[in-house]
Structure formats: structure tokens, C-alpha cells
A protein has these predicted regions:
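Loop-to-transmembrane alpha-helix entry segments
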Residues: 69-72, 91-105, 124, 215, ...
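Small-residue-rich hydrophobic segments that form or flank transmembrane alpha-helices
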Residues: 9-73, 135, 145-199
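Residues within membrane-spanning alpha-helices of integral membrane proteins
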Residues: 5, 48, 102-105, 109, ...
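Interfacial loop-to-transmembrane junctions
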Residues: 207-229
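Transmembrane helix exit motif
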Residues: 55-64, 86, 94, 98-125, ...
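Small-residue-mediated transmembrane helix hinge/kink sites in multi-pass secondary transporters
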Residues: 32, 85-90, 150, 210-211
Length: 242
């Protein structure tokens, strides 16, 4: 078990660094990778708690960039619908959720690599729709950051503004779904001991990501990240049929 958690912590740190740099959030990489070493619903529970600390770190590091209007218009529907998505995990079979997660993540990554997401228009309607979809999928499959990222990209925010605005929205989403996951038994008493490690990882990963962001072209790194996501989700999807 300790060996599993050691790998889990390494994956969490890697995903946190990558998530900060790419602006997609760490869950799109972390959830499918962590599901290889731990039960999927346990990953959902731990990820939600981990992300609370992760987003607090990002909000502190990038706090000057928060766009309050976008955060409210995208964040309110996300917070409302994440609860609905999280409750669905009690009724949909786990294997089907995992398969659906990997299919959706693979499709989003492929869509973003194609460049078509740049055609999304800057509008309140897209903010409300993006918030609804990102929140629902964050609750159901553990990640909605890519959809939120696609929506935010239409507004041409600066790096700091993009990350800070995304983080404060994600904060509300994670607090909401964490409550549902804990009530559903996904995060149990035995996992409380992980919290100090998750706090350290979230701070270290966010800080490292911010420093690296100054040296690596964001666009180049995003394509690398998307490639890793494609490969990871494809491998996980194939494992479903083994």
C-alpha cells in the first residue's frame, strides 16, 4: 500500500507542475494516471481534497490576475452542476465511468490539438455553457479543467489571469464535489493522513510550475501535455477491454 501511495504522490506532483504550466488543471492528467495505481472512486475523493489545496496555492501565487466577472459567470453554473455530476457516480457503474472519462479526455485533447477550440467566441452564453459542462464532468469523471480551459481561451487572458481565474472557479467546484464524495465514502478516515503530503505537493508543484512557466513557451508545452494526455487516456481505454 505504501508503494502505491509513493507512486500516487509522484504522479500528483508531476500533474500539479504540468497542470500549472499548461493552464488545463492537473486533474486531466492526474485522474487517469492515478487510476492505474488506486481505485477510481478513491482517486475521485482524494483528487477533490487535493485540488482544494492546489487551487489555494495557485490563487495565492497568481492572485493579481483574477477576472471577477468571468469567474462569476463561468463559476456559478460550474459549482451548481458539479454536485449533479458527482451524485451520478453513485448510480453509474465504475468501469463505465472510467471508460467514459478516458473517451472524453481523449476527445478533448484531440480537439485542442486540432486548433478548432480557438474558434469559440467570447460571449456570456459560452461562459454559462462552459461552466455547466465543466462542472458536470468534473463531478462525474473527476476532471473538467480542459472544458473550462477551452472556454477561457476565447477571452485571450494573460497567463497569470488565466491560471488565477481558472483556479478560483475550480476551488468552488472542488469544495462542492468533495462534500459529495466524502458523503459517498470515496474519501475515508484512512485517507486523512494523506492531507499533509497533499498540501506540500500542491504548494511545491504550483510554485515549480510558475517558475518553469517563465522559461518554456506555453504553446509548445501545451502540445507536449496534450500528447501525454492522449497516450494516457488511450492506454486506460484499452485496459477496459482486457
Amino acid at each position: 500500500m505504501m508503494g502505491q501511495y509513493f507512486i500516487f504522490f509522484l504522479l500528483a506532483l508531476l500533474a500539479e507542475i504540468v497542470g500549472t504550466i499548461s493552464g488545463f488543471g492537473s486533474s486531466i492528467l492526474f485522474v487517469p494516471l492515478a487510476s492505474i495505481v488506486l481505485d477510481f472512486k478513491v482517486v475521485l475523493g482524494i483528487t477533490a481534497v487535493f485540488h482544494v489545496f492546489s487551487n489555494l496555492s495557485k490563487i495565492y501565487l497568481f492572485q493579481k490576475g483574477i477576472d471577477k466577472q468571468i469567474a462569476l459567470k463561468l463559476g456559478i453554473p460550474a459549482v451548481l452542476f458539479v454536485t449533479l455530476g458527482a451524485w451520478q457516480t453513485n448510480y453509474i457503474p465504475q468501469k463505465e465511468i472510467e471508460l467514459g472519462m478516458n473517451f472524453i479526455i481523449f476527445s478533448i485533447a484531440l480537439y485542442m490539438m486540432s486548433g478548432h477550440h480557438k474558434r469559440i467566441k467570447e460571449s456570456n452564453t459560452n461562459l454559462y455553457l462552459g461552466g455547466t459542462l465543466s462542472g458536470f464532468f468534473a463531478g462525474l469523471i473527476g476532471t473538467g479543467g480542459a472544458i473550462r480551459g477551452i472556454t477561457l481561451a476565447a477571452f485571450n487572458l494573460e497567463k497569470d489571469a488565466f491560471i488565477a481565474t481558472s483556479a478560483i472557479i475550480d476551488m468552488g467546484v472542488d469544495v462542492s464535489r468533495a462534500g459529495v464524495y466524502i458523503a459517498s465514502g470515496y474519501f475515508q478516515r484512512e485517507h486523512v493522513i494523506l492531507i499533509p503530503f497533499l498540501i506540500i505537493i500542491s504548494i511545491a508543484g504550483s510554485y515549480a510550475g510558475k517558475r518553469i512557466l517563465n522559461y518554456i513557451p506555453e504553446k509548445t508545452f501545451q502540445y507536449i501535455v496534450l500528447g501525454v494526455i492522449l497516450l494516457t487516456s488511450l492506454i486506460q481505454g484499452v485496459r477496459y477491454f482486457w
